């Protein structure tokens, strides 16, 4: 099986970036900086969702499937790793494995955020950005199939693909996962991440991000079934593989116990 990397990111408003752009004093508390930026955004758009470049990445979680029977779910980096380190490690993973990336709205959110944040830090991601003119042995192949072009296959944005690239047809991962019999979100969602981060609950955010990565992977497996990439037996085998993997983690990682219990 080709290496599959289903991923998800969690973000919070970039407090330092907001301070810089609006020349806010260092004495202003972080929560007030965020409130200021949200008010500005509401005045501009009617909503408080920050522009992509003002999202600080606090977690990147992956569900990776490779080789004959290998699967791993985890969050990149250690708890005390900064944003720059985590982003660099994500692109190093791509550099090492050249996986099939799978996301839900990754083209609309996750990857653009990663682009802007890696630009801020000056992170090298040559393999990821290869569009046929790189120095890798197979770079020529990337002219026709790369991570960047919307209709290429190295990155499969499932939401975009299933919506036939029509934004009005986009639907939430949580809805589709639950309709397909998968757990979906359990307790936390993106709107609660800033409050959790501000309260020091980074571990909870990382756990939530991991469940979103697995939900994304499960949706990809279902897509492989309906698109004919898997027959029914192959699909059931892959579903059983990831379910058994998660079940084996439940003693040490309670979020997987909750996830498996919620799985119909």
Task: Tell where the protein language model's regions lie, with residue ranges.
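Short C-terminal domain-edge/linker segments immediately following a structured domain
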Residues: 34-42, 90-93, 132-137, 238-240, ...
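C-terminal accessory extensions appended to soluble enzyme cores
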Residues: 234-264
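Charged, low-complexity, helix-prone segments enriched in Lys/Glu/Asp/Gln
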Residues: 22, 31-46, 209, 223, ...
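Metal-dependent phosphoesterase core characteristic of DEDDh/y 3'-5' exonuclease domains
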Residues: 2, 55-58, 62-80, 98-207, ...
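Generic alpha-helical secondary structure signal
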Residues: 26, 40, 94, 120, ...
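Exposed alpha-helical structural elements
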Residues: 17, 32-35, 89, 172, ...
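Conserved non-catalytic scaffold segment of RNase H-like nuclease domains
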Residues: 1-116
């Amino acid at each position: 099986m080709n290496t599959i990397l289903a991923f998800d990111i969690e973000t919070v408003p970039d407090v330092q970036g907001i301070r810089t752009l609006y020349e806010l004093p260092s004495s202003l508390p972080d929560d007030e900086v965020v409130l200021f930026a949200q008010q500005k955004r509401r005045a501009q758009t009617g909503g408080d969702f920050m522009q992509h470049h003002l999202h600080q990445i606090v977690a990147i979680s992956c569900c990776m499937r490779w080789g004959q029977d290998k699967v791993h779910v985890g969050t990149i980096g250690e708890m005390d790793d900064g944003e720059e380190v985590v982003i660099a490690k994500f692109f190093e993973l791509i550099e090492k494995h050249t996986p099939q990336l799978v996301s839900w709205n990754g083209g609309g959110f996750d990857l653009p955020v990663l682009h802007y944040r890696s630009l801020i830090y000056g992170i090298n991601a040559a393999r990821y950005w290869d569009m046929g003119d790189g120095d890798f042995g197979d770079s020529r192949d990337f002219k026709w199939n790369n991570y960047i072009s919307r209709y290429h296959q190295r990155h499969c944005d499932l939401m975009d693909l299933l919506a036939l690239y029509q934004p009005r047809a986009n639907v939430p991962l949580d809805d589709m996962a639950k309709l397909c019999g998968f757990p979906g979100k359990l307790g936390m969602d993106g709107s609660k991440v800033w409050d959790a981060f501000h309260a020091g609950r980074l571990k909870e955010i990382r756990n939530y991000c991991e469940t979103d990565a697995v939900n994304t992977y499960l949706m990809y497996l279902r897509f492989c079934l309906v698109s004919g990439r898997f027959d029914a037996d192959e699909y059931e085998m892959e579903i059983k593989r990831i379910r058994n993997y998660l079940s084996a983690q439940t003693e040490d990682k309670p979020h997987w116990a909750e996830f498996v219990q919620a799985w119909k």
